[in-house]
């Protein structure tokens, strides 16, 4: 299997499977002198890990990360300092139940990558989906923790803005609420609605889709590139690579098709300190593939997981027609735990473009 690496200067390679002994990543291209602690990396992994509420998979993984290379300890015994060599991180799997998947060893789950992996490689890891499992994304979150440290002043946040047909009220948006509920919802009023709705989905053994919004603040104006190396192009690619993602938009995205040029264009004025000021941010912080200095805003849509208890029609690898129902432990809405994953992938794209701009223009420190 190829294509396990993304990025240009800030390059991330992930490895491992859902039911293997461990998984992890290698971050290559991180500049020397980047300071971070194991606790900081662990905090982001804790945000993504399973089993934290009844609304996510009950697989119990502590997701304890180990840093194996690419750093030296500071005198305080806690702070790690990057050396400029590859940073390797590992997370052990401890709660696999491969027997739960024995019934689908030859059967293709409708809506899952079972068939396409078999079509491409002639073999597939049916135990939890192997590399196609969202378990792989734990390694991306670890890499994203490093990426956040590369760009000075960068703040990346995410929130769940829609589950099924139930959307947040954007006038209630409060970042302080995101970590106060099991959905990473910025609107406290939507929480009881989602709780009741997802309880019904969960008890029925079904699943539902969602929309996640990620925002990066402190992105330097000018990073990115035109035409074939656009910042938004790479952000979209990173987000699209996340399991179950079926659509990505930047700024007002598809809503731009419904408004006029007068409404869509972000007008400008000169600020109190002589700096350029935008009067809106329909562009989502990117114009012509290059950052404007405004917050970078992206959203991505996530399909319902195909691992459900309802029987669905399918075929098996012997060419027989079968009915498939998936046992095991699964998220009724994978969009919840996709929030920190989206944050990590956005951070990695921005860190990569920051280093590329610094190498090309020399204007960034």
Curated annotation (Swiss-Prot):
Cofactor(s) this protein cannot do without: FMNH2
Gene3D superfamilies: Chorismate synthase AroC
Listed pathway(s): Metabolic intermediate biosynthesis; chorismate biosynthesis; chorismate from D-erythrose 4-phosphate and phosphoenolpyruvate: step 7/7
Residues that, per the record, bind FMN: 131-133, 243-244, 288, 303-307, 329
Enzyme Commission code: 4.2.3.5
Manner of cofactor binding, per the entry note: Reduced FMN (FMNH(2)).
GO molecular function: chorismate synthase activity; FMN binding
Residues noted as binding NADP(+) in the record, renumbered to the chain: 48, 54
Gene Ontology annotations for the cellular component aspect, listed alphabetically: cytosol
GO biological process: amino acid biosynthetic process; aromatic amino acid family biosynthetic process; chorismate biosynthetic process
Residues in the signal sequence: none
Catalytic activity line of the entry: 5-O-(1-carboxyvinyl)-3-phosphoshikimate = chorismate + phosphate
UniProt xrefs under PROSITE patterns: CHORISMATE_SYNTHASE_1 (PS00787), CHORISMATE_SYNTHASE_2 (PS00788), CHORISMATE_SYNTHASE_3 (PS00789)
UniProt cross-references to InterPro entries, sorted A to Z: Chorismate_synth, Chorismate_synth_AroC_sf, Chorismate_synthase_CS
Alphabetically ordered keywords of this record: Amino-acid biosynthesis, Aromatic amino acid biosynthesis, FAD, Flavoprotein, FMN, Lyase, NADP
Keyword tRNA-binding: no
Subunit structure: Homotetramer.
Family: Belongs to the chorismate synthase family.
Function: This reaction introduces a second double bond into the aromatic ring system.
Protein name listed in UniProt: Chorismate synthase
Organism the protein comes from: Rhizobium meliloti (strain 1021) (Ensifer meliloti)
Phylogenetic placement of the source organism: Bacteria, Pseudomonadati, Pseudomonadota, Alphaproteobacteria, Hyphomicrobiales
Gene: aroC
């Amino acid at each position: 299997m190829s294509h396990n690496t993304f990025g240009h200067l800030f390059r991330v390679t992930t490895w491992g499977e859902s039911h293997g002994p461990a998984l992890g990543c290698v971050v290559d291209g991180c500049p020397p002198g980047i300071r971070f602690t194991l606790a900081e990396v662990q905090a982001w992994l804790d945000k993504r890990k399973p089993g934290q509420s009844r609304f996510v998979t009950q697989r119990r993984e502590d997701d304890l990360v180990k840093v194996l290379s690419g750093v030296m300890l500071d005198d305080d015994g806690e702070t790690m300092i990057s050396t400029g060599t590859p940073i390797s991180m590992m997370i052990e799997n401890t709660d696999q139940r491969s027997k739960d998947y024995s019934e689908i060893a030859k059967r293709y789950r409708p809506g899952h990558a079972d068939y396409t992996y078999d079509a491409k490689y002639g073999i597939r890891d049916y135990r939890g989906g192997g590399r196609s499992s969202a378990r792989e994304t734990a390694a991306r979150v670890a890499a994203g923790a490093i990426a956040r440290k590369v760009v000075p002043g960068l703040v990346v946040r995410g929130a769940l803005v829609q589950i099924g047909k139930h959307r947040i009220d954007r006038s209630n948006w409060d970042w302080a609420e995101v970590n106060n509920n099991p959905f990473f919802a910025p609107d406290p009023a939507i929480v009881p609605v989602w709780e009741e709705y997802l309880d019904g989905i969960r008890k029925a053994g079904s699943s539902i889709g969602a929309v996640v919004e990620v925002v990066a603040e402190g992105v330097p104006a000018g990073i990115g590139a035109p035409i074939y190396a656009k910042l938004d192009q790479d952000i979209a690619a990173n987000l699209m690579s996340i399991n179950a993602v079926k659509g990505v938009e930047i700024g007002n995205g598809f809503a731009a098709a419904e408004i006029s040029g007068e409404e869509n264009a972000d007008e400008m004025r000169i600020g109190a300190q002589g700096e350029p000021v935008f009067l809106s941010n329909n562009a989502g912080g990117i114009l012509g593939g290059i950052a404007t200095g405004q917050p970078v805003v992206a959203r991505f849509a996530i399909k319902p997981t195909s691992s459900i208890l309802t029987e669905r029609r399918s075929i098996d690898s012997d060419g027989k027609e079968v009915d498939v129902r998936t046992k095991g432990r699964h998220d009724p809405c994978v969009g919840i735990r996709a929030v920190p994953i989206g944050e990590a992938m956005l951070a990695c794209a921005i860190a990569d473009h920051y280093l590329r701009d610094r190498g090309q223009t020399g204007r960034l420190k």
